[in-house]
Regions:
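ABC ATPase nucleotide-binding domains
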Residues: 261-283
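Conserved ABC ATPase signature
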Residues: 161-165, 169
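Conserved catalytic motifs of ABC-family nucleotide-binding domains
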Residues: 182
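Helix-to-loop junction immediately C-terminal to a conserved catalytic motif
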Residues: 75
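Conserved ABC transporter NBD signature motif
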Residues: 83-91, 100
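Catalytic Walker B motif of ABC-type/P-loop ATPase nucleotide-binding domains
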Residues: 186-190
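The feature captures the beta-strand-to-loop junction immediately N-terminal to the Walker
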Residues: 60-62
Length: 283
């Protein structure tokens, strides 16, 4: 828990971390059981892919394709009905809560805070997997919270109130809270949803830098085809609960496949850097 007033935190410079991870998803499937008997049951899978530290992976697909459902399986919030999801050889759903939170951080779609918090207090909440019950934060907690703020360029925000931040500032602080957990696997559910184009590019650049420099495996649920192509190493493409393609953007971005998935007339052209660009026909 944070001490009253948030306390003065040490001002630290982030250094490249040692996080490295191997995520293995093997024939994982899941089903949402409908509460209304007349409604169809949504089924995801089977899904298979792997991800490593220093990789930025996008989970792409239209609404109701299973992207967020897959993320809850990766985070261990739900258990696959069949198949396995492992992090460094450990089955995610079998990990004890604190042990899982020390390996995996999930940034869900933005929700309202129940009570006002300063940025520093909010980021310190990310240290819960390491804190003993009814204890104030330790020097080590402050060290990692300060490093997390530095990693996202939010040092100067530490004394601000969360409800006074802009959309881009708030997204950086939410990311810092996740980084304070010291995860090796970072999962984000549509983090660009409320950002303008400049904010979206800045966030993807930051995630790319976190993967490259701090060796996280980063997985992002997004609708942003072009940004995913530009910044991500690999794509997991979902459609109606099925995993259609897994591969590099150049391997996945086939015109006929994307038109089927997104139900729109599209063109795919290659940029000089070898990454595909998707153009909506008639735009």
């Amino acid at each position: 828990m944070s001490s009253a007033g948030g306390g003065a935190a040490p001002r630290l410079t982030a250094t490249p971390g040692t996080a490295i991870v191997h995520l293995k998803v093997e024939q994982a499937s899941y089903a949402h059981l409908a509460t209304d008997r007349s409604a169809p049951t949504f089924t995801l899978g089977p899904v298979s892919f792997e991800a490593q530290g220093q990789e930025l992976v996008a989970i792409l697909g239209p609404n109701a394709s299973g992207k967020s459902t897959l993320l809850t399986l990766l985070a261990g919030l739900n258990k696959p009905l069949s198949g396995r999801i492992e992090v460094d050889g450990n089955e995610v759903s079998q990990l004890e809560l604190r042990a899982r939170a020390q390996r995996i951080a999930l940034v869900q779609q933005e929700s309202e805070l129940l009570f006002p918090l300063r940025v520093w207090e909010y980021v310190l909440q990310g240290r819960y997997p390491y804190q003993r019950r009814l204890r104030f934060e330790s020097d080590e907690d402050c060290l990692f919270a300060g490093n997390a703020l530095a990693q996202v360029g939010a040092d100067l925000l530490r004394d601000r109130w969360m409800d006074q931040l802009s959309g881009g500032e708030k997204q950086r602080v939410i990311l810092a809270r996740a980084l304070a957990q010291q995860p090796s696997l970072l999962l984000l559910d549509e983090p660009t949803q409320h950002l303008d184009i400049g904010g979206k590019v800045e966030l993807l650049r930051r995630l790319r830098r976190l993967a490259d420099t701090h060796r996280y495996a980063v997985m992002v649920v997004t609708h942003e085809l072009d940004l995913a192509s530009e910044f991500c190493d690999r794509i997991v493409l979902l459609h109606k609960g099925r995993c259609l393609r897994v591969g590099t953007p150049a391997e996945v971005y086939e015109r006929a496949v994307l038109e089927e998935v997104f139900e729109a007339p599209l063109e795919v052209e290659m940029r000089p850097n070898g990454r595909p660009r998707v153009i909506l026909q008639g735009s």
